[in-house]
């Protein structure tokens, strides 16, 4: 399986590509006043309002840097048996892919944090990569609330 690898600070993370719709350059986002700091804002993609989460803010507590390599990774966050739920993930240095045969999965999952959206840790030749579980990032209710809030500020 192919994975998109990105970096937040000194740590590397990966998203499995089957969930990725496309990778976009950073665009201007409309902010949603009163939303969580992890919500970077919303934008329109092919006529649909898409909420964007700042992964650096979510995982490290600081806003993503405006780097040339900062991208919006557009994913379908809906489970296979659910309707499509487009979600943008603001990720720094999202410029590398990795095949699953290039890494080893750590047999024992180390739970240093209680984040439901972090899953297996993978070991590459360079370092350890933490996999992101996109289906756990935002509940259906939270997603619907962001879309409703975006409609009031549009």
Predicted regions located by residue number:
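An acidic, low-aromatic, low-complexity terminal/linker signal
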Residues: 1-154
């Amino acid at each position: 399986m192919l994975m998109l690898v990105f970096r937040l600070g000194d740590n590397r993370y990966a998203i499995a590509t089957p969930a990725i719709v496309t990778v976009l350059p950073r665009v201007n986002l409309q902010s949603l006043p009163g939303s969580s700091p992890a919500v970077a804002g919303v934008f329109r993609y092919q006529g649909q309002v898409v909420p964007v989460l700042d992964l650096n803010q979510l995982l490290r507590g600081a806003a993503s840097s405006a780097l040339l390599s900062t991208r919006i990774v557009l994913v379908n966050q809906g489970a296979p048996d659910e309707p499509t739920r487009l979600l943008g993930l603001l990720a720094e240095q999202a410029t590398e892919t990795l095949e699953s045969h290039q890494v080893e999965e750590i047999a024992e999952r180390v739970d240093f944090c209680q984040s439901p959206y972090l899953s297996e840790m993978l070991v590459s030749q360079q370092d350890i990569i933490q996999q992101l579980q996109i289906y756990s990032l935002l509940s259906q209710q939270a997603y619907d609330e962001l879309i409703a809030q975006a409609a009031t500020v549009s």
